[in-house]
Protein backbone atom coordinates (compact mmCIF):
# COMPACT_ATOMS: atom_id res chain seq x y z
CA UNK A 1 0.00 0.00 0.00
CA UNK A 2 1.35 3.41 -1.00
CA UNK A 3 1.67 5.99 1.76
CA UNK A 4 1.47 9.72 1.09
CA UNK A 5 4.74 11.18 -0.15
CA UNK A 6 5.21 14.95 0.07
CA UNK A 7 8.26 16.81 -1.22
CA UNK A 8 9.16 20.10 0.51
CA UNK A 9 11.58 22.31 -1.42
CA UNK A 10 13.23 25.72 -1.25
CA UNK A 11 16.52 27.45 -1.97
CA UNK A 12 19.18 27.33 0.75
CA UNK A 13 18.29 29.81 3.49
CA UNK A 14 14.56 30.11 2.76
CA UNK A 15 13.58 28.16 5.88
CA UNK A 16 11.91 25.16 4.26
CA UNK A 17 13.48 22.76 6.78
CA UNK A 18 12.56 24.83 9.84
CA UNK A 19 8.99 25.55 8.71
CA UNK A 20 8.30 21.96 7.67
CA UNK A 21 9.70 20.56 10.95
CA UNK A 22 7.41 22.89 12.91
CA UNK A 23 4.44 21.83 10.75
CA UNK A 24 5.31 18.17 11.45
CA UNK A 25 5.32 18.95 15.19
CA UNK A 26 1.81 20.42 14.85
CA UNK A 27 0.61 17.37 12.91
CA UNK A 28 2.05 14.92 15.46
CA UNK A 29 -0.11 16.58 18.13
CA UNK A 30 -3.12 15.75 15.91
CA UNK A 31 -2.02 12.14 15.44
CA UNK A 32 -0.78 12.65 11.87
CA UNK A 33 2.69 11.08 11.83
CA UNK A 34 4.92 11.79 8.85
CA UNK A 35 8.47 10.54 8.72
CA UNK A 36 10.62 13.57 7.89
CA UNK A 37 13.47 12.64 5.55
CA UNK A 38 16.16 15.00 4.31
CA UNK A 39 17.12 14.03 0.77
CA UNK A 40 20.39 15.92 1.20
CA UNK A 41 21.24 13.98 4.36
CA UNK A 42 20.62 10.66 2.66
CA UNK A 43 22.69 11.81 -0.33
CA UNK A 44 25.44 12.97 2.03
CA UNK A 45 25.45 9.60 3.83
CA UNK A 46 25.82 7.80 0.50
CA UNK A 47 28.49 10.22 -0.83
CA UNK A 48 30.44 10.06 2.43
CA UNK A 49 30.32 6.24 2.41
CA UNK A 50 31.86 6.45 -1.07
CA UNK A 51 34.57 8.87 0.19
CA UNK A 52 33.44 11.61 -2.22
CA UNK A 53 32.84 14.44 0.28
CA UNK A 54 33.60 15.45 3.85
CA UNK A 55 30.85 18.10 4.29
CA UNK A 56 27.39 18.59 2.77
CA UNK A 57 28.19 21.80 0.93
CA UNK A 58 30.83 19.99 -1.16
CA UNK A 59 28.11 17.91 -2.81
CA UNK A 60 27.15 20.83 -5.10
CA UNK A 61 30.64 20.72 -6.55
CA UNK A 62 30.64 17.03 -7.47
CA UNK A 63 30.58 16.38 -11.20
CA UNK A 64 27.06 15.88 -12.62
CA UNK A 65 27.47 12.15 -13.30
CA UNK A 66 28.51 11.49 -9.71
CA UNK A 67 25.64 13.64 -8.41
CA UNK A 68 23.18 11.68 -10.55
CA UNK A 69 24.46 8.35 -9.27
CA UNK A 70 24.23 9.51 -5.64
CA UNK A 71 20.70 10.91 -6.23
CA UNK A 72 19.51 7.59 -7.60
CA UNK A 73 20.92 5.66 -4.64
CA UNK A 74 19.33 8.12 -2.18
CA UNK A 75 15.97 7.97 -3.98
CA UNK A 76 15.95 4.21 -3.69
CA UNK A 77 16.70 4.39 0.05
CA UNK A 78 13.88 6.88 0.67
CA UNK A 79 11.40 4.90 -1.44
CA UNK A 80 12.02 1.95 0.87
CA UNK A 81 11.28 4.15 3.91
CA UNK A 82 8.02 5.36 2.32
CA UNK A 83 6.70 1.80 2.28
CA UNK A 84 6.45 1.97 6.08
CA UNK A 85 4.78 5.36 6.70
CA UNK A 86 3.83 8.68 5.09
CA UNK A 87 6.98 10.61 4.25
CA UNK A 88 7.84 14.28 3.88
CA UNK A 89 11.01 14.63 1.82
CA UNK A 90 12.97 17.81 2.53
CA UNK A 91 15.02 18.61 -0.58
CA UNK A 92 15.90 21.19 -3.22
CA UNK A 93 13.87 21.46 -6.42
CA UNK A 94 17.05 22.44 -8.25
CA UNK A 95 20.70 22.58 -7.20
CA UNK A 96 22.88 25.44 -8.44
CA UNK A 97 26.17 23.93 -9.67
CA UNK A 98 29.16 25.45 -11.49
CA UNK A 99 27.78 23.90 -14.73
CA UNK A 100 24.20 25.11 -14.30
CA UNK A 101 21.04 24.04 -12.49
CA UNK A 102 20.76 20.35 -11.71
CA UNK A 103 17.23 18.99 -11.18
CA UNK A 104 16.87 17.99 -7.53
CA UNK A 105 14.32 15.36 -8.50
CA UNK A 106 15.27 13.94 -11.89
CA UNK A 107 13.10 11.27 -13.50
CA UNK A 108 14.93 8.37 -11.84
CA UNK A 109 14.25 9.88 -8.39
CA UNK A 110 10.65 10.88 -9.25
CA UNK A 111 9.94 7.36 -10.49
CA UNK A 112 11.06 6.01 -7.11
CA UNK A 113 9.28 8.59 -4.93
CA UNK A 114 6.07 9.19 -6.96
CA UNK A 115 5.08 12.20 -4.80
CA UNK A 116 1.48 13.24 -4.15
CA UNK A 117 2.32 16.87 -3.34
CA UNK A 118 5.26 19.17 -4.01
CA UNK A 119 5.64 22.24 -1.80
CA UNK A 120 7.89 25.16 -2.78
CA UNK A 121 8.80 27.46 0.14
CA UNK A 122 9.81 30.96 -0.98
CA UNK A 123 10.48 34.53 0.14
CA UNK A 124 12.23 37.50 -1.45
CA UNK A 125 15.81 37.25 -2.67
CA UNK A 126 16.82 40.05 -0.29
CA UNK A 127 15.45 38.20 2.75
CA UNK A 128 17.23 34.98 1.77
CA UNK A 129 20.50 36.84 1.16
CA UNK A 130 20.33 38.40 4.64
CA UNK A 131 19.56 35.02 6.24
CA UNK A 132 22.52 33.42 4.48
CA UNK A 133 24.88 36.20 5.51
CA UNK A 134 23.90 35.79 9.17
CA UNK A 135 24.22 31.96 9.15
CA UNK A 136 27.78 31.21 10.27
CA UNK A 137 27.12 27.46 10.52
CA UNK A 138 27.18 26.88 6.75
CA UNK A 139 29.71 27.45 3.97
CA UNK A 140 27.67 28.97 1.14
CA UNK A 141 28.55 30.43 -2.24
CA UNK A 142 28.12 34.19 -2.46
CA UNK A 143 24.99 35.09 -4.41
CA UNK A 144 23.07 38.27 -5.12
CA UNK A 145 19.35 38.81 -4.52
CA UNK A 146 18.93 38.61 -8.30
CA UNK A 147 20.63 35.20 -8.63
CA UNK A 148 18.56 33.93 -5.69
CA UNK A 149 15.37 35.12 -7.45
CA UNK A 150 16.52 33.32 -10.61
CA UNK A 151 17.09 30.15 -8.58
CA UNK A 152 13.60 30.42 -7.09
CA UNK A 153 12.13 30.84 -10.59
CA UNK A 154 13.98 27.70 -11.71
CA UNK A 155 12.57 25.90 -8.63
CA UNK A 156 9.01 26.82 -9.61
CA UNK A 157 9.56 25.66 -13.19
CA UNK A 158 11.08 22.39 -12.01
CA UNK A 159 8.32 21.79 -9.43
CA UNK A 160 5.62 22.18 -12.09
CA UNK A 161 7.53 19.81 -14.37
CA UNK A 162 7.69 17.28 -11.54
CA UNK A 163 3.94 17.70 -11.09
CA UNK A 164 3.31 17.13 -14.80
CA UNK A 165 5.40 13.95 -14.72
CA UNK A 166 3.84 12.49 -11.55
CA UNK A 167 0.39 14.04 -11.24
CA UNK A 168 1.43 15.68 -7.95
CA UNK A 169 -0.08 19.02 -7.01
CA UNK A 170 2.28 21.95 -6.46
CA UNK A 171 1.81 24.40 -3.57
CA UNK A 172 3.78 27.65 -3.11
CA UNK A 173 4.19 28.76 0.54
CA UNK A 174 5.64 32.16 1.47
CA UNK A 175 8.02 32.24 4.47
CA UNK A 176 8.53 35.97 4.99
CA UNK A 177 10.68 37.45 7.76
CA UNK A 178 8.74 37.66 11.01
CA UNK A 179 5.86 35.58 9.61
CA UNK A 180 7.12 32.04 10.26
CA UNK A 181 3.89 31.15 12.11
CA UNK A 182 1.85 31.89 8.97
CA UNK A 183 4.09 29.67 6.83
CA UNK A 184 3.89 26.87 9.42
CA UNK A 185 0.08 27.14 9.58
CA UNK A 186 -0.19 26.98 5.78
CA UNK A 187 2.13 23.96 5.65
CA UNK A 188 0.22 22.22 8.45
CA UNK A 189 -3.08 22.71 6.60
CA UNK A 190 -1.82 21.41 3.27
CA UNK A 191 -0.13 18.37 4.86
CA UNK A 192 -3.24 17.19 6.77
Swiss-Prot record:
Keywords linked to the UniProt accession: ATP-binding, Cytoplasm, Kinase, Nucleotide-binding, Transferase
Endpoints of the signal sequence: none
EC number: 2.7.4.3
Claim: RNA-binding is one of the keywords in the record: no
Main subcellular location of this protein, as a coarse class: cytoplasm
GO-annotated molecular function: adenylate kinase activity; ATP binding
Residues that, per the record, bind ATP: 10-18
Reaction catalysis annotation: AMP + ATP = 2 ADP
Temperature dependence: Active from 30 to 40 degrees Celsius.
Record-level GO cellular component terms: cytoplasm
UniProt subunit comment: Monomer.
Family affiliation: Belongs to the archaeal adenylate kinase family.
The protein's name: Adenylate kinase
Organism: Methanococcus voltae
Amino acid sequence: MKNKVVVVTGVPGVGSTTSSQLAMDNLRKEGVNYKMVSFGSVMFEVAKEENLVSDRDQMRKMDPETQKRIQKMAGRKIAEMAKESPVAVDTHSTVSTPKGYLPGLPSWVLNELNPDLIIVVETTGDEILMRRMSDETRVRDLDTASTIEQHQFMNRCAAMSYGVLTGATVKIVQNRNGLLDQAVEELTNVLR
